[in-house]
């Protein structure tokens, strides 16, 4: 996935969500 991991968080769809709890 083209998500930028930052501080154990992933930027996806302009939202900050914990890595591992990302919804597809």
From Swiss-Prot:
The keyword Lipid biosynthesis does not apply. Keywords: Cell outer membrane, Membrane. It is found in: Cell outer membrane. GO terms for cellular component: cell outer membrane. Its absence leads to imipenem resistance. May be involved in transporting molecules across the outer membrane. This is 29 kDa outer membrane protein. It comes from Acinetobacter baumannii.
């Amino acid at each position: 996935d083209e998500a930028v991991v930052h501080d154990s968080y992933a930027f996806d769809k302009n939202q900050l969500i914990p890595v591992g709890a990302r919804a597809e």
